[in-house]
UniProtKB/Swiss-Prot annotation:
S-adenosyl-L-methionine binds at E70, D95, D122, D145. One of its GO terms (molecular function) is tRNA (guanine(46)-N7)-methyltransferase activity. Pfam families: Methyltransf_4. It is an enzyme of class 2 (transferase). PROSITE patterns: SAM_MT_TRMB. Its EC number is 2.1.1.33. Keywords: Methyltransferase, S-adenosyl-L-methionine, Transferase, tRNA processing. The active site is at D145. The keyword S-adenosyl-L-methionine applies. GO terms for cellular component: tRNA methyltransferase complex. It comes from Neisseria gonorrhoeae (strain ATCC 700825 / FA 1090). This is tRNA (guanine-N(7)-)-methyltransferase.
């Protein structure tokens, strides 16, 4: 692989492809009283409101520790556990779904975690407008919606245009860690990441699950049913 400019994209990147990318799909979900209370009482301490201008993450966290972006955290259990396991790393966790946001805030409070900040916004807009180039040491995207039906594959988050937006935000030596339990999506992820000359796979293909990523209940249930899980860890080399 060779070093390339930060805005390097694969040859097949669609021209003008930008605003069609979305990091989420709206769905109906019930907010419990405890989740709403967490948002009401903890947001000022651990929440970050969206702004359309670059943010100083060190100032927002009050530290110069390494910064990891997590896109889509579900109910937040894995996010809280990773932050507990890596106390010398800061995590910016982004999701749009209220119950998950409330639950993660609740877990942050219960576990006395000081190294997570939460955003409730479209991660694509955060990446485009709020994150400074070279501000991230890593990016986690675990179990994004696989959109099983072929006609819906265009809705998948892990596609070349989105990775092209993420790459400039990573420091050289920073990493992207993806995980999925859908084999065909894992193959697509591998193809997409491998198409960037300034990303280097840390494994021959799929990586062993890093120690910091806990097994989720959903993941454990899938394994009992014979389903696989695939992790991919690529490092930025230029």
């Amino acid at each position: 692989m060779t070093d390339t400019p930060e805005n390097q994209t694969p040859n097949d990147l669609p021209a003008g492809h930008s605003r069609s990318i979305r990091s989420f799909v709206l769905r109906q979900s019930h907010m419990t009283a405890a989740q709403q209370r967490a948002i009401d009482t903890l947001w000022d301490s651990f929440g970050i409101d969206y702004q359309a201008t670059p943010a100083d993450l060190d100032a927002r966290f009050g530290s110069s520790r390494p910064k990891i972006l997590e896109i889509g955290f579900g109910m937040g259990m894995a996010s809280a556990e990773i932050a507990r396991r890596l106390p010398e790393t800061d995590f910016l966790a982004i999701d749009v779904h209220g119950p998950g946001v409330g639950n993660l805030l609740k877990l942050i409070n219960e576990n006395h975690l000081e190294n997570i900040r939460v955003m409730r916004h479209d991660a694509v807009e955060v990446v485009e407008n709020m994150l400074q180039d070279g501000s991230l040491d890593g990016i986690h995207i675990f179990f994004p919606d696989p959109w099983h039906k072929k006609r819906h594959h265009k809705r998948r988050l892990i596609q070349a245009p989105f990775i092209a937006k993420l790459l400039p935000k990573l420091k050289t030596g920073g990493y992207i860690h993806l995980a999925t339990d859908w084999e065909e999506y894992a193959q697509q992820m591998l193809e997409v990441l491998s198409s960037f000359d300034n990303l280097q796979n840390t494994a021959a293909d799929y990586a062993p699950t890093p120690d910091y990523r806990p097994e989720t209940k959903f993941e454990a249930r899938g394994k009992r049913l014979g389903h696989g899980v695939w992790d991919l860890v690529f490092k930025r080399i230029g």
